[in-house]
Amino acid sequence: MGEKTRTASQDARSRQPPDPNSPRVPHGRLDARLPRQQPEVVCPRRRLAVASNRRSPNDAAMDSKVTVAVRCRPLMPREERAGAEAVVVLEDRRVAVGDPVELAARGSSPILGRNFAFDLVLGGDSQAEVHETLGVPLLRHAWRGLNASIFAYGQTGSGKTYSMTGGDGESRGIIPRVCEGLWDAADAHSQTHETTVEASYMEVYNERVRDLLVPTGRPLKVREHPTKGACVPELTVVRVRGRNELAELLAVGSDARATAATRGNARSSRSHAVVSLVVSRRRRSGSSEGITEEGWWSDLDAPGSCTSTIRLVDLAGSERVAVTGTDGARLQEAKAINKSLAALCDVVSALAANSRKKKAFV
């Protein structure tokens, strides 16, 4: 099944107005449209997560097939004014959750409260540090011809979109930084390799797939391809000619994404969004080894020609309807979000079972 390939200029001419029945955010640059942090419902003296004791990097964790990292955002001013308290302490690769009084008395004791272990724990890390920890290893895998993905998962208002997309300048998230790093490497290898990038951007809204680059309002069908697996044949795929063009495509897609205000989040993503980048590298005829500058790619023994796919997924946040108080259209969205996240949990569990050589269907 073929995919529809367009240039960005063709895409801009044929783009139709977004579905008026879907909530939207105003158009603007991708790196300037989201707040630094997303608000969350706060009750007086509510216990929320805050980071202390930053973990030491664990490079080996990123060498496995699946790496699970947790990032805890700090309390926001609104939460502090409401009397929220920190109940989470980060220690190396462990997250401890306990009573605030015990936290204050015992500090970062690893035996405090309930403990959860992860491959990586991120607390007060900057956006740049998060990218170095998660984004750069993804780029290194993709540059060697391996497919790589990042999923941002968590409850509504926990900061997923901030981590993935971010804001302006130093607050840029993983998606824009991965795109920049990709073009940095392509430019550095331009004398020896020809690099092509094809981009697509889609969302799953109310269990329906929609194209975010050419939003028509009608759902797209998911098909099973004999070699590609599950795919969306009608999804727009754009061959990108430069980093600025890619940034503009991301801005167009983010503008079309379903977003609305809820009691739990002033700008809540009401859909799961997937950015896909197909990266193809081919050695130029008669070229010799060598790059024009150093970077994250410098020590890689990458193949001369290869193709890989990068998928960057910003999942909608799980919601407790009794807390967020959603109704009407927002309630239907919340039901669809929670249902799809439960299905994703089943898929992950089945994959984990398969890795332990148990029979499970995915």
Please state what every model-predicted region is.
Residues 3-6, 10, 40:
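Charged/polar low-complexity intrinsically disordered segments
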Residues 4-6, 160, 291:
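Intrinsically disordered/low-complexity terminal segments and short unstructured peptides
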Residues 14, 20, 36-37:
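Compositionally biased, low-complexity intrinsically disordered regions
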Residues 24, 28, 34-38, 43-47, ...:
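P-loop NTPase "switch/coupling" elements that transmit nucleotide state to mechanical/effector output
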